[in-house]
């Protein structure tokens, strides 16, 4: 049996693709891993693999396109564990390919914005008290080099929609959030960073987008794990990485006014209360 290290990690979107590999690797390193996904069969299959290798994991199902389920997921995490040393917001939707049509979440928001960005924003804020109580701790947001400036006049892309545009906007939103969060948590012992794990990994999401994979999920997992556990990242925060190299994101990520606009909008859309806002 793998020797437990006493730490707990929560990885969203970890029943498939790169998240699955990350969850397994963390379990191999002695982490207690909270696994998340929508598919019960995949979730329990992963638990069986981790248990067979001597690791410890639990499966927490939830559909991140529903903020009711996002809140339920946060409550479940809080009930399951008294500490959270690592949060990896990995769950997401791809571009949907060239024929993608505009879809909305259970709450009426553009689907990729809701799942790729807003769900992680809300989940992170709801889990902050738990994370703060476990400091030093890390938050890793899995983003992309595919980024497009947010149009604050049409965030939900009701005009000129494309799946690619929606995906790129949601991924940049993650980075604005990461930088803002890192600054808010300065001197708390919690770091927040974002990354593009690898280009066109061999995952179902990439293949469904009509793209030929050119990278392996192991490459992407290695980049995520470096941000998650490497001692060389101790104290480094508010950064964006392309693979394992620090990089510059789209210019909007470094615009303080844009970050504030997104934050205010996200608290409103996410239905976060003043007390939840004060968790920062």
Report the location of each language-model feature.
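Canonical Rossmann dinucleotide-binding motif of NAD(H)/NADP(H)-dependent dehydrogenases/reductases
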Residues: 2-34
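Conserved glycine-rich Rossmann-like NAD(P)H-binding loop of the short-chain dehydrogenase/reductase
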Residues: 29-45
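The beta1-alpha1 cofactor-binding region of Rossmann-like NAD(H)/NADP(H)-dependent oxidoreductases
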Residues: 40-41, 60-75
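A glycine-rich helix->loop->beta "capping" turn
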Residues: 52-56, 76-89, 95-104
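Catalytic loop of short-chain dehydrogenase/reductase
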Residues: 92-113, 132-190, 196-211
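A short, exposed helix-loop element centered on a Lys and neighboring polar residues
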Residues: 124-125, 179
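C-terminal helical subdomain
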Residues: 211-264, 268, 272, 277
């Amino acid at each position: 049996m793998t020797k437990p290290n006493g730490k707990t990690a929560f990885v969203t979107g970890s029943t498939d693709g790169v998240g699955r590999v990350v969850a397994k690797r963390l379990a191999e390193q002695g982490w207690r891993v909270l696994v998340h996904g929508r598919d019960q069969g995949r979730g329990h299959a992963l638990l069986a693999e981790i248990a067979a290798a001597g690791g410890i994991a639990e499966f927490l199902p939830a559909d991140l396109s529903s903020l009711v389920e996002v809140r339920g997921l946060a409550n479940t995490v809080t009930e399951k564990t008294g500490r959270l040393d690592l949060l990896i917001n990995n769950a997401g939707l791809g571009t949907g390919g060239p024929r993608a049509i505009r879809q909305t979440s259970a709450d009426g928001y553009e689907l990729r914005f809701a799942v790729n960005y807003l769900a992680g924003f809300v989940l992170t804020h709801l889990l902050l008290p738990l994370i703060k109580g476990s400091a030093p701790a890390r938050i890793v947001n899995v983003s992309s080099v595919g980024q497009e400036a947010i149009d604050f006049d049409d965030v939900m892309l009701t005009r000129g929609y494309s799946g690619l545009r929606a995906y790129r906007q949601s991924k940049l939103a993650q980075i604005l959030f990461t930088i803002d969060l890192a600054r808010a948590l300065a001197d708390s012992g919690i770091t927040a960073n974002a990354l593009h794990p690898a280009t066109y990994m061999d995952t179902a999401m990439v293949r469904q987008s009509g793209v030929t994979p050119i990278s392996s999920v192991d490459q992407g997992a290695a980049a995520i794990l470096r941000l998650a556990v490497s001692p060389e990242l101790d104290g480094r925060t508010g950064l964006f990485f392309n693979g394992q190299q620090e990089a510059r994101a789209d210019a909007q990520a470094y615009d303080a006014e844009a970050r504030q606009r997104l934050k205010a909008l996200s608290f409103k859309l996410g239905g976060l209360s003043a007390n939840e806002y004060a968790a920062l």
